[in-house]
């Protein structure tokens, strides 16, 4: 399971539409050192920022096939959530941003599916974000 998260994290680091990754297993995470002392591992929750804002987050979330749409994240299957259009929708944008909930933020709770299948599913969903022309192409 740990290697799955590492493979997905590495995939996100290389993808042009993923602007940032928040994962307690990253040394750059502000609570990385505390996590080493308190937990056996950083867990399966990976949060990433997809370029293109709310529409990009919705397209990604609605385009994956293996991930289950979830408001609450927990279980053995991979779950996906777009907070700006789901759990935090009723908050004003300023309040969401103050809490670190940006428009393109997506939460992914990695389950037990085959990692290659998850990567392929995320890739085809991110391709749909690109096809929606919500972000500028870079040369």
Language-model segments: which ranges?
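Electropositive phosphate-/nucleotide-binding environments in soluble metabolic enzymes
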Residues: 2, 6, 40, 54, ...
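PLP-dependent enzyme catalytic core of the Aspartate aminotransferase-like
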Residues: 73, 78-139
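Conserved small-domain helix->loop->beta segment predominantly found in fold-type I
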Residues: 6-65, 71, 91-97, 134-139
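Glycine-rich beta-alpha junction loops
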Residues: 2-4, 25-29, 50-52, 75-80, ...
């Amino acid at each position: 399971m740990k290697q799955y998260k590492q493979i997905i994290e590495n995939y996100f680091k290389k993808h042009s539409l993923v602007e940032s990754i928040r994962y307690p297993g990253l040394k750059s995470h502000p609570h990385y050192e505390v996590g080493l002392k308190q937990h056996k591992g950083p867990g399966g929750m990976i949060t990433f920022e997809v370029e293109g804002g709310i529409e990009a987050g919705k397209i990604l979330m609605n385009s994956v096939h293996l991930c289950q749409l979830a408001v609450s994240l927990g279980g053995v299957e991979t779950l996906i959530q777009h907070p700006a259009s789901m759990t935090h929708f009723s908050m004003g944008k300023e309040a969401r941003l103050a809490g670190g909930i940006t428009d393109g933020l997506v939460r992914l709770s990695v389950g037990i599916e085959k990692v290659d299948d998850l990567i392929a599913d995320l890739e085809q969903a991110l391709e749909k974000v690109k096809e929606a022309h919500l972000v500028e192409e870079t040369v």
